[in-house]
């Protein structure tokens, strides 16, 4: 992702309905986990890293590019630069790895999963969120440097090949999928943009309602997986 997109994302992250809901989902996944050492891969604006810290985790952000690392430091995060397929960490040093909207940027996602397995302690948790459904592929994906969108089957296969057991897999951003599909048909680039506050509030209400509806097995715009390192 270009530096301008990284900074745009960081500016949007605090209030944008999509990022707020993603932080809520992360917080939900942390319930029941004993806090320890965590790595947030692709931290960008640092919202997820702050969620980890707020829940008692000793969290470090990882960014590939200089611009992303600079943004993370400006926001008060402990950050290291590195490649998700060659993490600058020792074996079995972490209890949790978070990779939200990361794998879709990496040509060799098998290598990224294997690296997460290497740095996790036996029984450690790998939380992964990715864009779902190749049918939604559009100019937006190209603009933000995606190389793929995932299905449940191929995401599960990547993680299982990497040495993980799938503990849960769910869709999210389900209710708005028809709107996203329609908009992406005429997309000419990234849809990362600041929204009218009223529109943002309305979309936030829709995505919040999704928490209370049994739709997590329906087709959505994104997938969220909780996986555990097999010993």
Predicted regions and their residues:
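Conserved N-terminal segment of class I S-adenosyl-L-methionine
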Residues: 1-92, 96-100, 113, 192-193, ...
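Short, glycine-/aromatic-enriched active-site segment of Class I SAM-dependent methyltransferases
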Residues: 10-11, 126-148, 152-160, 183
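A structural helix-start
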Residues: 66, 106-110, 130
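Residues lining the SAM
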Residues: 100-103, 129
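A short glycine-rich, Lys/Arg-flanked "PGG" loop and its adjoining helix->strand segment in the class I
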Residues: 110-125
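Conserved S-adenosyl-L-methionine
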Residues: 164-174
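A C-terminal cap/extension of S-adenosyl-L-methionine-dependent methyltransferases
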Residues: 173-231
